């Protein structure tokens, strides 16, 4: 694909298909797409060179995904069979002499838009490709609320955006306390993202007899290297708040066994706030196969953390020394201590003492498995595959890899194919009981090892010292929930590639969201679990949840969910639909009631082509707006909007009219309104009607008449500006059906409060205010011809004498000369609109009528 030849729309389409940001100029879009294309190259082109120094850390390839995107994983090459010794005991190189992570594309970790560079004390290098991806990536929440990226998790440099973009981001959304996880789930469901095509996870021909990190018994956001002895967590966006755990594939229940773990890197997470406690920490230890990945936070899960504390069942106690990057922790399990099992640890070869004593009877003969829980750290294990250990081992202990296979207990093996996997999609309103049912169902089916995909499960992995982050969290709670929702969207995309069993714990009331979320899981056993309690039970559960967790979902969001609630049906994307409480018939009736309730309480449907305003200045916000399809703007808008500048037909009040093809307002038929530019019922200055009129051939004007011997007495001033009987401008045209051929003046009266533009009374057809116009210059050759438009036939006109009661000083000749210049300029300006004025012959104007002569 030649990125340079793609158009902007094509670039955005390609970026959207890959789940990348589609905002920016064409150059930025092209750079972003080029980076994504390079990231899709095979792994053998993206690995480190084989001549890397032994012991030097290689690249950590992290994935680059945006919301709605898919995980870009390459093809994993199987490691050579058997155990391969490393080049150096203290090195961090893989079996091939270099460290190549699990065919995963790089993860964007930074939000710095000026200097996108990771500071790495351990020497982890980043190639230009990663920098291009980091520069191309902009965190965003493209939602119906149009809410921008949160800034509280960004470094100060991230706010230094380009000026041309920053000026459009000055308006801030109001902060609402009641935006919890349910609200952001609802907002995501409203979004109409295109589903990503399902992708198969490449199979590895890994030797299953080796002790290694179990890719089935680890978190989805823990990335395992191809040699299965090292790994690291995702750290972009909200993932930096999450713990990420993994267990080994084999456990033990007898003997004296050990393994080692080394912290290779504390991954930079500059986007975390400075108030985040312990942004880099590792917890290492043992657990049962039935335990979750949250080491040390439940029974039979024992861990020793880098904060110098040991923990089990979320009880933390001081133990040993703190440890950090480049430290090596040895883990020892002694099953030969009578009726107890003793667990102890070493730091860099120094024994920390016995940490836990467990009764064998309590274990019930179950095996303990090596377990690690990390937060923004890359780690590597030594299960015995290395020729030499990192540090000295306590006497009498054996690496778990060196035990006979018969003495090792294999952990739970995952499904062999996607046909054996289940995806259960919860469907129900907030507080209906979806999470409660999911937890109970997973606990009652431990062999399936359900992965619950929900914001609540994400928040459980953000614990601090084993405690959930509550609303007294130092930062913005709604922003943290928003980050968790982003993580969930990414995990759903990753989950579609992994052969596991899942429970999708979200509302999923939108039919479009149901289809979109199930399509990537093609090949799974896709089932919908509908929880629809009675309306009374739902209200009680909502009150209880609000008391426990606070207001989670705004009322308007719940009403919108009710209005769009769609019960799923067995079809293309669902194999089975189960109703937990109300069954199908009762649920259908209740959902129809919810639909009606939501539609009545919700706002009216949005109209894409609507004119809502009337009366804005010069029509920028009034007179109908920028609408090509409807002319519903009420009269009164000043100048109207595009294609509707004339306002209502014949209505008064529109200033200067506009270009109205419908003929509304003034200047209709004969272009001047009802033959009188100052007519009461026409718009002041009217609107220009483009519609050509079928007119007879223009007639030759009669010869000019001699002026009257005596001018009329000067009129007097009146607040009405145009007093009754005052002479007004009348441009006559030979138009069938009009009164243009009669020279009867019409009276124009404007009240002072009306925002109209009236001028001192004068007759543009003949200045009859008591002066003799100078001889006009010869008119230029006509430059415009309206074709079928009727020509002007200014008939001789003698204005009637004004009322005697109206007297005011005689206007001077200079005033009339100034008016003449203004009108001449006015008609010259009309020539700047050839699309609207065609080839009309305006003639020249210099103290006389257009095409006629002045009279007195």
From Swiss-Prot:
Residues 456-594 are annotated as: Necessary for interaction with BRD7 and transcriptional activation. The modification Phosphothreonine is found at residue 209. Residues 35-205, 595-811 are annotated as: Disordered. It holds the Pfam family SPRY. Residues 612-626, 634-667 have a biased composition (Gly residues). Residues 668-693, 742-764, 784-795 have a biased composition (Low complexity). It is found in: Nucleus. Methylated. SMART domains: SAP, SPRY. Residues 191-388 form the B30.2/SPRY domain. Interacts with the adenovirus type 5 (Ad5) E1B-55 kDa, BRD7, PRMT2, TP53 and NXF1. Associates with histones and BRD7. Residues 612-658 are annotated as: 5 X 3 AA repeats of R-G-G. Residues 104-117, 725-741 have a biased composition (Polar residues). It comes from Homo sapiens (Human). This is Heterogeneous nuclear ribonucleoprotein U-like protein 1. Coiled coil: none annotated. Its main location: nucleus. Residues 213-856 are annotated as: Necessary for interaction with TP53. The lineage of its organism: Eukaryota, Metazoa, Chordata, Craniata, Vertebrata.
């Amino acid at each position: 694909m030649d990125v340079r030849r793609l158009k902007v729309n094509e670039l955005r389409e390609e970026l959207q298909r890959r789940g990348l940001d589609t905002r920016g100029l064409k150059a930025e879009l092209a750079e972003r797409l080029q980076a994504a294309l390079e990231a899709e190259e095979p792994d053998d082109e993206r690995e480190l060179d084989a001549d890397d120094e032994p012991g030097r850390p290689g690249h950590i390839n992290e994935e680059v995904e945006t919301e709605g995107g898919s995980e870009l994983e390459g093809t994993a090459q199987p490691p050579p069979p058997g155990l391969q010794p490393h080049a150096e005991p203290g090195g961090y190189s893989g079996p091939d002499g270099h460290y190549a992570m699990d065919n995963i594309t790089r993860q964007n970790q930074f939000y710095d838009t000026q200097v996108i560079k990771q500071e790495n004390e351990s020497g982890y290098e980043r190639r230009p490709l990663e920098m291009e991806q980091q520069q191309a990536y902009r965190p965003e929440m493209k939602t119906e609320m149009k809410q921008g990226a949160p800034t509280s998790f960004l470094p100060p440099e991230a706010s230094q955006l380009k000026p041309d973009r920053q000026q459009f981001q000055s308006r801030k959304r109001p902060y609402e306390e009641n935006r919890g996880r349910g609200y952001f789930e609802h907002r995501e469901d409203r979004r109409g993202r295109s589903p990503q095509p399902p992708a198969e996870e490449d199979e590895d021909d890994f030797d299953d007899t080796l002790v290694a990190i179990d890719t089935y018994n680890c978190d989805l956001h823990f990335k395992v290297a191809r040699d299965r002895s090292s790994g690291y967590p995702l750290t972009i966006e909200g993932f930096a708040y999450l713990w990420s755990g993994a267990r080994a594939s084999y456990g033990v229940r007898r003997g004296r066994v050990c393994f080692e773990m080394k912290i290779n890197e504390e991954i930079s997470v500059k986007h975390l706030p400075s108030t985040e406690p312990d942004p880099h920490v590792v917890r290492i230890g043992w657990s049962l196969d039935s335990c979750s990945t949250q080491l040390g936070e439940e029974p039979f899960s024992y861990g020793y953390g880098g904060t110098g504390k040991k923990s089990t069942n979320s009880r933390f106690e001081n133990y040993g020394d703190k440890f950090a990057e480049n430290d090596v922790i040895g883990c020892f399990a002694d099953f030969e201590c009578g009726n107890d099992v003793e667990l102890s640890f070493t730091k860099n070869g120094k024994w920390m003492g016995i940490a836990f004593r467990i009764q064998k009877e309590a274990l019930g003969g179950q095996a303990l498995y090596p377990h690690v829980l990390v937060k923004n750290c890359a780690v590597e294990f030594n299960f015995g595959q290395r020729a030499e250990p990192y540090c000295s081992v306590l006497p009498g202990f054996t690496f778990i890899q060196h035990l006979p296979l018969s003495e090792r207990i294999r952990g739970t093996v995952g499904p062999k194919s996607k046909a054996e996997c289940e995806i259960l999609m919860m469907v129900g309103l907030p507080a209906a009981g979806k999470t409660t049912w999911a937890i109970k169902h997973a606990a009652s089916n431990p062999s399936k090892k359900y992965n619950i995909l929900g914001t609540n499960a994400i928040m459980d992995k953000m614990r601090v010292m084993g405690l959930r982050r509550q609303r007294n969290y130092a930062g913005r709670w709604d922003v943290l929930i928003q980050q968790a929702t982003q993580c969930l969207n990414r995990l759903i995309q990753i989950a579609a590639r992994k052969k596991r069993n899942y429970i999708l714990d979200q509302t999923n009331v939108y039919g479009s969201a149901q289809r979109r979320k199930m399509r990537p899981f093609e090949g799974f056993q896709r089932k919908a679990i509908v929880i629809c309690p009675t309306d009374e039970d739902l209200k009680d559960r909502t009150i209880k949840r609000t008391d426990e967790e606070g207001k989670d979902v705004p009322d308007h969001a719940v009403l919108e969910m009710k209005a769009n609630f769609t019960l799923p049906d067995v079809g293309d994307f669902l194999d089975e639909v189960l109703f937990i409480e109300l069954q199908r018939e009762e649920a259908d009736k209740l959902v129809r009631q919810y639909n009606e309730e939501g539609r009545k309480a919700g706002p009216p449907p949005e109209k894409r082509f609507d004119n809502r305003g009337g009366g804005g200045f010069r029509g920028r916000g009034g007179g109908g707006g920028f609408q090509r399809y409807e002319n519903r703007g009420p009269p009164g808008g000043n100048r109207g909007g595009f294609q509707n500048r004339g306002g209502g037909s014949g209505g008064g009040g529109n200033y200067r009219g506009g270009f109205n093809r419908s003929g509304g307002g003034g200047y209709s038929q004969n272009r001047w309104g009802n033959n009188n530019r100052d007519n009461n019922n026409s718009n002041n200055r009217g609107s220009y009607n483009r519609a050509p009129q079928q007119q007879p051939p223009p007639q030759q004007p009669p010869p000019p008449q001699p002026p009257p011997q005596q001018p009329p007495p000067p009129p007097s001033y009146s607040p009405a500006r145009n007093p009754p009987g005052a002479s007004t401008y009348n441009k006559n045209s030979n138009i069938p059906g009009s009164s243009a051929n009669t020279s009867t003046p019409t009276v124009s009266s404007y009240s002072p409060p009306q925002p109209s533009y009236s001028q001192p009374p004068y007759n543009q057809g003949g200045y009859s205010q008591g002066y003799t116009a100078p001889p006009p210059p010869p008119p230029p050759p006509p430059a415009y011809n309206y074709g079928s438009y009727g020509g002007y036939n200014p008939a001789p006109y003698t204005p009637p004498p004004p009322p005697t009661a109206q007297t005011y000083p005689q206007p001077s000749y200079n005033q009339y000369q100034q008016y003449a210049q203004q009108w001449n300029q006015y008609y010259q300006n009309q020539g700047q609109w050839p699309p609207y004025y065609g080839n009309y012959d305006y003639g020249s104007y210099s103290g006389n009528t257009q095409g006629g002569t002045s009279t007195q």
